[in-house]
A protein has these predicted regions:
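Active-site catalytic microenvironments in core metabolic enzymes, especially phosphate/sugar-handling
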Residues: 1-99
Length: 99
């Protein structure tokens, strides 16, 4: 069974890190790199609907084109990850679901 770190390395072979913008937060952002993965959900953006779908399907990993924690887009919101704010609420759900 592949682990998150192996999937990340395979993705970097297809899309090398150095092709990303310097402000783009690429790579594994949350959870254990050693987690085994049976199911992956691929999405353009990590939204509440995407997280719900990943939970419903029993996914251990979401691979998205746009990073959930993008410093350029979410700089102010990342300073406090509160569950009453959008980004904090999504991250809390992902951590609880071990995705």
């Amino acid at each position: 069974m592949p682990i998150v770190a192996q999937i990340e390395q395979a993705l970097f072979q297809l899309a090398p890190k150095d092709l990303a913008f310097d402000w783009d937060n690429v790579g594994h952002l949350e959870g254990s790199p050693d987690q085994e993965v049976q199911r992956v959900l691929v999405a353009l953006d990590v939204t509440e609907n995407v997280v719900s779908e990943a939970e419903k399907l029993g996914c251990q990993l979401i691979v998205s084109h746009h990073p959930l924690m993008n410093v350029r887009w979410h700089q102010a919101e990342m300073q406090t990850l509160r569950p009453n704010r959008y980004l904090g609420r999504l991250l809390r759900r992902l951590v609880k679901a071990d995705i």
